[in-house]
């Protein structure tokens, strides 16, 4: 590790097997400005470790693109551990629930947009863009959310607030600037994206921070002192000479731009009126007139309106059809893109634009939106491609397009440093598959193993989970209806042994790193289709490749082409690994991977609480006899702070104790209040 380098890789391991050769090939091609490369790495060969080494050698800001939030969360954890002193960030959709605006002409049903935003992920998204604007040592792990419209990087950077000690500036001007950046004044509840004023002291809680706020102390119009403080207690952490505060939203716009945008929105409305009058569509004319005029009034009075993103083209002064700014525009021109599980991620990138366009077409046709709403959209594939400087496609089963882009050259990584072989695959009849699978589950669980069970539908995964639970088998299901944070928590609980069987569909395929899994059972393996294709079967089998006892059972009444090809590839790779093991005297061993916390829900900061120590219970029990209401509230803040600190340092039992103590004080608070 070279301390003069920006990206510093921290690991106790050295590249081995065919990792060194893969790293050298990838780095050499990147330095030679080759645009596209393919890394074909089997499950368990250390593709993530290889890419971490590549980043450390090329020293470039990197975007790692994953095809779902679960895989993105896992990659974020891993890169955070590899680069603890660099800005490793997480950028995925911040919606826990999202119902887009839509209209169904057949039933004349208008569906208003409804959503629930995850505050933690919103903070992480803002932290990601702030890091890109302030630092060069940035690694961002993202889902396809990165190709959706985001606020202009020029406006976001240009509207920041820079304060320095000794600077002369009126306090009211600072407050007005904060409001323009969409911060709210709140002198009672100090939370993210708010500020409070107490005499000559101004406290600001940046939108991208979690446990750090800024205190600005003034004397008249002079900034006398700037400090970093604890937002819970107000305790000063350290004095600083200057600070730059970034907006609390990516969709900020300077006032002069907003006024110009309102003019162009009115002009577009006039054009649309004429169109509907010519077509004699008076109902649609009334709709668009009423909706747009109301939005313009809101923009004039409060600076924003519901569905403001549909006017994004006007606010960014783009031409019709021009692509919106997105996360890719925040990166410097020489950034490196890594597309993980590219055979899955690229089709997603292709599909995003068409799905969005079809829904909005109806809204525009029937007068619910102006045509400019079309330009609030994800990027087309060719627009994404045009923003790529250099890319590495990473997959165990790369698609033909990626290979063609790389000029037919593939960097292979087929050896597992752990010596683990591809799992033995057994074919069993599909008739009676559930009962047979149950017996196998009991056998593996009794030995401390975990089981992945894949089905073809969400409904079947839920019904099968209920059936297993009724038979005293601890099981949970995982599919796309489960929100981001909960998915991560479910996988962590499986690894910890809170339950033993995870039932799912395609979320149990690419990238999930669960070394405790000793059995993968594939129901209805002979049902040819997307979920039982050659690629899908190889990827699903790979989930058992991190355990020395790993096995796969396919339940099928016939051997399909996909099953046959999977068996051939697996046998070939087993033979290659066995030769390597014999040559180097390696005994296969199960991967050991630390179980860490990525994000905790607000409700349950710690997954596995222990019993609270008796003295803590006693202290909380007796507290109401001598504590005032203000003292109880201070105790709650102290407990919350200690709980978060313990959880962040992975002292889970202690964190659970603090959480339980906090809840006791909250009950006492209710009684006293």
Curated annotation (Swiss-Prot):
Alphabetized UniProt keyword annotations: ATP-binding, Cytoplasm, DNA damage, DNA excision, DNA repair, Excision nuclease, Nucleotide-binding, SOS response
Location of the protein in the cell: Cytoplasm
One Gene Ontology term from the biological process aspect of the record: SOS response
Chain residues that bind ATP: 41-48
GO cellular component: cytoplasm; excinuclease repair complex
MF terms in GO: ATP binding; ATP hydrolysis activity; DNA binding; excinuclease ABC activity
Signal peptide feature range: none
Domain UVR: 633-668
SUPFAM superfamilies documented for this protein: C-terminal UvrC-binding domain of UvrB (SSF46600), P-loop containing nucleoside triphosphate hydrolases (SSF52540)
Subunit structure: Forms a heterotetramer with UvrA during the search for lesions. Interacts with UvrC in an incision complex.
Entry's family note: Belongs to the UvrB family.
Domain remark text: The beta-hairpin motif is involved in DNA binding.
HAMAP family named in the record: UvrB
Name recorded for this polypeptide: UvrABC system protein B
Species annotation: Protochlamydia amoebophila (strain UWE25)
């Amino acid at each position: 590790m070279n301390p003069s380098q920006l990206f510093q890789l921290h690991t106790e391991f050295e590249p081995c097997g065919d990792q060194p050769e893969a790293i050298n090939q990838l780095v050499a091609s990147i330095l030679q400005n080759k645009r596209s490369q393919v890394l074909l790495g089997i499950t368990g060969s250390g593709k993530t470790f290889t890419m971490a080494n590549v980043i450390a050698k090329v020293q470039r800001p990197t975007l790692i693109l994953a095809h779902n939030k679960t895989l993105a969360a896992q990659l974020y954890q891993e890169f955070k551990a590899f680069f603890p002193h660099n800005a490793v960030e997480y950028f995925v959709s911040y919606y826990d629930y999202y119902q887009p605006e839509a209209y169904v002409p057949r039933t004349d049903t208008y569906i208003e947009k409804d959503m629930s935003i995850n505050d933690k992920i919103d903070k992480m998204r803002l932290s990601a863009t702030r890091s890109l604007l302030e630092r060069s040592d940035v690694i961002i792990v993202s889902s396809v959310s990165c190709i959706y419209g985001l606020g202009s990087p020029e406006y976001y950077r240009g509207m920041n607030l820079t304060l320095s000690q000794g600077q002369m500036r009126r306090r009211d001007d600072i407050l007005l600037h904060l409001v323009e950046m969409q911060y709210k004044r709140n002198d009672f509840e100090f939370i993210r994206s708010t500020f409070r004023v107490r005499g000559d002291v101004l406290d600001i809680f940046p939108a991208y921070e979690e446990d750090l706020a800024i205190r600005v102390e003034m004397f008249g119009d002079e900034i006398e002192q700037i400090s970093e403080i604890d937002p819970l207690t107000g305790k000063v952490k350290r004095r600083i000479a200057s600070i730059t505060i970034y907006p609390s939203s990516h969709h900020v716009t300077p006032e002069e731009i907003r006024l110009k945008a309102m003019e162009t929105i009115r002009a577009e409305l006039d054009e649309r009126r004429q169109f509907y009058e010519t077509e004699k569509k008076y109902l649609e004319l009334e709709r668009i007139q009423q909706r747009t005029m109301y939005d313009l009034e809101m923009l004039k009075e409060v600076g924003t309106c519901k569905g403001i993103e549909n006017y994004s083209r006007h606010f960014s002064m783009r031409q019709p059809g021009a692509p919106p700014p997105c996360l890719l525009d925040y990166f410097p021109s020489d950034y490196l893109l890594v597309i993980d599980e590219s055979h899955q991620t690229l089709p997603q990138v292709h599909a995003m634009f068409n799905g969005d366009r079809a829904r909005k077409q109806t809204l525009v046709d029937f007068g619910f939106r102006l045509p400019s709403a079309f330009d609030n959209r994800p990027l087309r594939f060719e627009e994404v491609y045009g923003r790529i400087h250099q890319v590495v496609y990473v997959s165990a089963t790369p698609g033909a397009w990626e290979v063609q882009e790389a000029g037919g050259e593939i960097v292979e990584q087929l050896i597992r440093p752990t010596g683990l072989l591809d799992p033995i695959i057994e074919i069993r009849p599909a008739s009676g598959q559930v009962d047979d699978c149950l017996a196998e589950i009991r056998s593996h669980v009794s030995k401390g193993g975990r089981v992945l069970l894949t089905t073809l539908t969400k409904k079947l995964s839920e019904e099968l989970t209920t059936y297993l639970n009724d038979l005293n088998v601890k099981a949970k299901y995982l599919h796309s209806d489960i929100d981001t944070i909960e998915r991560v928590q479910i996988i962590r609980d499986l690894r910890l042994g809170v339950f033993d069987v995870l039932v799912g569909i395609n979320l149990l395929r690419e990238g999930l790193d669960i070394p405790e899994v000793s059995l993968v059972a594939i129901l209805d393996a002979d049902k040819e289709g997307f979920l039982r294709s050659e690629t899908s079967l190889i990827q699903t089998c790979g989930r058992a490749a991190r355990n020395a006892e790993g096995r796969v059972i396919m339940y099928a009444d016939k051997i399909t082409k996909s099953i046959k090809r999977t068996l051939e590839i697996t046998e070939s790779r087993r033979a290659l690994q066995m030769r390597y093991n014999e040559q180097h005297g390696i005994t296969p061993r199960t991967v050991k991977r630390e179980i860490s916390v990525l994000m905790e829900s607000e409700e349950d900061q710690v997954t596995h609480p222990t019993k609270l120590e008796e003295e803590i219970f006693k202290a909380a029990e007796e507290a109401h006899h001598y504590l005032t209401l203000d003292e109880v509230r201070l105790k709650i803040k102290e407990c919350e702070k200690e709980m978060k600190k313990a959880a962040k340092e992975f002292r889970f039992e202690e964190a659970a104790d603090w959480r339980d103590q906090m809840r006791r004080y909250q009950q006492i608070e209710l009684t006293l209040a």
